[in-house]
């Protein structure tokens, strides 16, 4: 797919201040050091300012404070990275679905599929499902009974929605994602695990994105709920009954145990793990590989574990950690000895 758009049109779309030729053709996007004629780029971080001198881009998105650093055509905006994000969709080569149903798709007689939806090859849509206008469902996807997909949703090939999954508007779900699988629920009877039926569903709000091979389990009783604007990276596990607040983002390999509640506008970096039945308040940032074992009630940044260091230093640190209990006992003895001597000295001076 190729697209050509005038620089002036981009300026109008962004509400940017245009400096240069409004009729210049823009045909693509590229990084500042790689952009060539016809491509627009951006300067978001000061360490890349050095590339402005030799930039070959047709135009650059700049903050007004950086305008004097570049003599070429530019669009001046408060946040160049955000502006780049907004115009990136003009140049997205992702194929657009064509309205209609592929002849190999299998659709239940009582399923409701809007004529403006695009249903790919070998898709299965079960009884009672409802597919809204503008939805694209990629090849070999499975939509279970009574599922609902809101307007403008985009499901890549090989997405699986078990029964009773409800999805809001403009949701993106990548290949291999499974929504509504059975939660991990068992009761122990004298050492034997008895399965608990998972009778809840999964509910996603509007503008949610779900990454490749991410799993969101159905609730045991009520639905597992993902709020509006939530962004989930690849290979994330969200267990039954979890609730995620609006506009929270999670990087790859996050694991969230059952019945945990995460607030709004939180960020969880890669590999974070959370135990079950805890609450995370709004506005929390959790750094990579952190293990969260209790509720967080105050906004802010949280970490656990040790950061990377040279292997030899790490081995020494690990060896010291094994001795920390012994070191603590020795320190307590020293403190008591010092306290005894101090008390004796005080008594002597008083006498």
UniProtKB/Swiss-Prot annotation:
Pfam family, one: Hexapep
Disulfide bonds: none
Keyword Cytoplasm on entry: no
Domain of life: Bacteria
Catalysis performed (reactions): a UDP-3-O-[(3R)-3-hydroxyacyl]-alpha-D-glucosamine + a (3R)-hydroxyacyl-[ACP] = a UDP-2-N,3-O-bis[(3R)-3-hydroxyacyl]-alpha-D-glucosamine + holo-[ACP] + H(+)
Keywords in alphabetical order: Acyltransferase, Lipid A biosynthesis, Lipid biosynthesis, Lipid metabolism, Repeat, Transferase
Lipid biosynthesis recorded as keyword: yes
List of catalytic residues: 240 (proton acceptor)
Enzyme Commission number(s) of this protein: 2.3.1.191
Pathway per the UniProt entry: Bacterial outer membrane biogenesis; LPS lipid A biosynthesis
GO CC entries: membrane
GO annotation, biological process: lipid A biosynthetic process
Coiled-coil segments on the chain, per record: none
GO molecular function: N-acyltransferase activity
Function according to Swiss-Prot or TrEMBL: Catalyzes the N-acylation of UDP-3-O-acylglucosamine using 3-hydroxyacyl-ACP as the acyl donor. Is involved in the biosynthesis of lipid A, a phosphorylated glycolipid that anchors the lipopolysaccharide to the outer membrane of the cell.
Family: Belongs to the transferase hexapeptide repeat family. LpxD subfamily.
PANTHER family (alphabetical): UDP-3-O-ACYLGLUCOSAMINE N-ACYLTRANSFERASE, UDP-3-O-ACYLGLUCOSAMINE N-ACYLTRANSFERASE 1, MITOCHONDRIAL-RELATED
Subunit structure: Homotrimer.
Protein name stated in the entry: UDP-3-O-acylglucosamine N-acyltransferase
Origin species: Pseudomonas savastanoi pv. phaseolicola (strain 1448A / Race 6)
Gene: lpxD
